[in-house]
A protein has these predicted regions:
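Hydrophobic faces of well-ordered beta-strands that scaffold small-molecule active sites
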Residues: 46-52, 71-74, 94-98, 154-158, ...
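Hydrophobic targeting/anchoring helices
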Residues: 114-121, 228-232, 248, 260-263, ...
Length: 731
């Protein structure tokens, strides 16, 4: 009887806490966007913020000054009042880390083990659906924010490398009773009736109160079927919900922090790459927080730039020294001209090592540290300076990332649980493909923005107003709403490019007999012919992760190639019988189905060989026929392409051009082939050719290069050049 009473009391307590939590955390979609917070008035230059690893601002400040470093980190905050006072006295900025403490958003010790190597559904330690978890984090925030908010705080970070589980390692959390309750409520809003859910899931539930998700272990057994017969809905819906839960809790923590310290952005550091695990749906995360330091995995830096451009939310990178001064210099310049406002320096072996106060490889970049935090950075870091991309969109479909991961995991069988985030970072087909599309456009002299699938689904973006061309990278999952929006984009004059496997699954991961946009592209599929060499579906084989990149494509052997590029769908044809570069017109626009996989472009040898030339020509021809031309072409010692990226920024009526080296693999190489200087190479002469006459000034040297279309200058591959471009045609 006593046990029964305790169970009743426990359930009542959970219910009471859940009802109070419901008043704070958003429970159903669509996820609302937290308001942006303008940059700190003093944050108009790039900053290097030193993490306190084997160093301390109070002890080593003179060493920081010697290097020209102007920022630091306060860990947690409570009890760190001396550092706050020091910040005020020296007028030096800091960010606060672990403000919500460690162990809740980033699981530690035994709690981490509980979410590692699990095949089934798992209860997350410190469930984010449990109001007690939220209350504990808020208590830490209250103490840490109160102790630190009077100084020059740039931002508050809840924790580092946060995750639903452990980084982006696979684990199907969270079936805590309150999480399941929340999931069922969310499903009811998504599906509106149990009949619709049963039809989608192919189940026979009587009501939402008994609905259960499936783990990947349960659904993976069905991935051997033809794609048209796949149904990942019970797993993908659960993963989508957990991404929503993660973002909703972060959003609530942001709003709470804003009540404690209005005017200071709140977010997190150590962001992982997009994937089905850990809570890393960037379309949601970008709505949930006001700033982020995300590792640049699978294009996160450009994703954040795209969606945070209008309000210039704070973005940072972590700076790990390579101990090669040229590589370190390049890193700082690269991320500054890509719009990051700061880096967090991990100072291992920086200070008090090898018998000296400052390590030689760090001291070697003393002038770089000073310059990059000086006047030159104000042109880019100024919150009113905005990225100015070309009207090209790259589609971000998180359901496709989930389904793509399932395709990658086929080769692992039961050992999929050991596909760690580290392994996935190097072998995730969707992630590498995203980077390939970025590098392709950059090599052709273009910039772009990512398109959020949520914005399209919720009709929050006018596609034709923003884009002339939209690219769908292996967008295997599309909802009917998304398909309708993309169809309308074409009808109104847009150009839509899909590489392969477009729209074969719906947004929940359920197969269709034909792709939802097959009629738009004018293609017909014969699925029984298979893919690549006809023997598999996985592209980058994670079982071969120890082998060189180009040796991991198991099913490319004997696959058909078009101009050296692998043809993916063996049985897809258009009305003319063509199997590649299939094009269809609809009203004012057109749709192009490539049926090609350019993943090998990520290899630097392929990129700058005949393979890369042929791939770039295919894309260049489509863009050119769509009315797009690069705003400048840069030649290095007479060569183009040359691994030089051009970036455009605008500040009211002023236009800035940045150029920087843009590697994929092997960043340390001094030379690529016979003609292209690597980051660690030598100073080169460059020629910049503009289509229209402009007036050009090098803002680093303040040298006026005159007026005209062609300009010569010097370029150090381990740095960046920044120019002011006066162009009468600029609007």
């Amino acid at each position: 009887m006593r046990l029964f009473s305790l169970i009743i009391l426990w359930n009542f307590s959970l219910w009471f806490l859940a009802m109070n939590c419901a008043a704070e955390v958003q429970l159903t979609s669509p996820l609302q966007t937290v308001s942006a917070i303008p940059s700190h008035p003093g944050q108009n230059r790039f900053s290097i913020l030193v993490w306190p690893y084997k160093t301390d601002i109070l002890r080593d400040f003179e060493l920081y000054r010697k290097l020209g470093i102007r920022g630091f980190q306060i860990d947690r905050g409570a009890g760190q009042e001396k550092k706050v006072e020091f910040s005020i006295k020296q007028n030096i900025p800091y960010y606060v880390g672990h403000a919500a403490d460690k162990g809740f958003l980033h699981l530690t010790r035994n709690n981490r083990k509980a979410v590692t190597n699990q095949h089934g559904l798992v209860i997350r330690p410190h469930s984010l659906a449990d109001p007690r978890t939220l209350a504990k984090m808020k208590d830490h925030l209250r103490r840490n924010v109160t102790a630190t908010k009077k100084g020059r705080v740039l931002a508050y970070a809840f924790d580092d490398e946060i995750s639903l589980g452990r980084m982006t390692n696979p684990c199907d959390v969270d079936i805590h009773p309150l999480s399941l309750q929340w999931f069922r409520k969310w499903l009811e809003k998504e599906y509106s009736s149990i009949e619709r859910l049963n039809l989608q899931w192919e189940t026979l539930y009587d009501g939402f109160d008994t609905v259960m998700p499936q783990s990947f272990e349960q659904v993976r057994k069905n991935t051997k079927k033809p794609l048209s017969r796949w149904n990942l809905s019970r797993w993908m819906d659960f993963r989508h919900f957990m991404d929503f839960q993660f973002a909703a809790v972060l959003s609530e923590l942001v709003l709470y922090t804003n009540t404690l310290a209005p005017g200071i952005p709140a977010g997190f550091v150590g962001g992982q790459g997009p994937g089905p695990w850990g809570g890393y749906d960037y379309a949601m995360l970008c709505r949930a927080v006001q700033w982020m330091e995300a590792y640049d995995i699978h294009g996160t830096n450009e994703i954040l730039r795209s969606w945070w451009n209008a309000d210039r939310r704070l973005r940072m990178q972590t700076f790990f020294s390579s101990k090669n001064p040229k590589l370190d210099s390049w890193f700082l310049w690269y991320y500054m001209v890509h719009g990051n406002q700061a880096v967090i320096a991990w100072p291992e072996d920086w200070f008090h090592t090898g018998g000296g106060d400052i390590a030689p490889h760090i001291l070697a970049n003393k002038q770089t540290f000073k310059e990059i935090q000086g006047e030159i950075s104000k042109y880019i870091v100024n919150p009113k300076t905005l990225s100015d991309p070309d009207p090209i969109g790259i589609y971000y479909s998180h359901p496709s990332i989930q389904a793509g991961w399932a395709m990658d995991a086929i080769v692992h069988g039961k050992t999929w649980i050991k596909r760690t985030g580290t392994l996935d970072n190097e072998n995730q087909t969707m992630g590498v493909l995203r980077k390939v599309w970025c590098k392709t456009l950059e090599d052709l002299g273009f910039q772009y923005d990512f398109v959020s699938y949520l914005d399209v689904e919720e009709a929050k973006v006018n596609l034709n107003k923003r884009f002339r061309v939209i690219i769908l990278p292996k967008t295997v999952c599309l909802s009917n709403k998304e398909a309708d929006a993309l169809r309308e984009f074409v009808e109104k004059g847009g150009v839509l490019i899909a590489d392969y496997l477009c729209g074969i699954l719906d947004e929940h991961g359920k197969g269709r007999s034909q792709g939802v946009l097959d009629d738009l592209f004018g293609v017909v599929r014969e699925e029984s012919a298979g893919y690549m060499n006809g023997k598999g579906l996985t592209e980058i084989d994670g079982e071969k992760y120890k082998k060189p990149y180009l040796q991991r494509f198991t099913y490319y052997k004997n696959a058909r190639r078009y101009k050296e590029i692998v043809v993916f769908e063996r049985g897809t044809r258009d009305s003319r019988g063509a199997n590649t570069l299939m094009e269809n017109t609809l009203k004012k626009g057109r749709a192009v189905y490539l049926n090609l996989s350019p993943l090998e472009y990520w290899n630097h040898v392929r990129r700058f060989s005949i393979y890369g030339h042929e791939w770039r020509k295919i894309i260049s021809d489509i863009l050119s026929s769509s009315g797009l031309q690069p705003r400048v072409r840069v030649y290095e010692n007479g060569n183009s392409p040359n691994m030089i990226e051009t970036l455009w920024w605008k500040h009211n009526d002023k236009q800035y051009l940045c150029i920087v080296k843009n590697p994929t693999e092997k960043k340390e190489l001094a030379k690529l082939g016979d003609a292209i200087e690597g980051i660690t190479g030598q100073t080169v002469n460059i020629l910049m050719k503009f289509p229209n006459p402009v007036e050009l000034t090098n803002l680093r040297t303040m040298k006026q290069l005159g007026k005209g279309r062609d300009f010569h200058d010097h370029f150090n591959p381990w740095e960046a050049n920044v120019y002011w471009v006066k162009d009468k045609t600029f609007q």
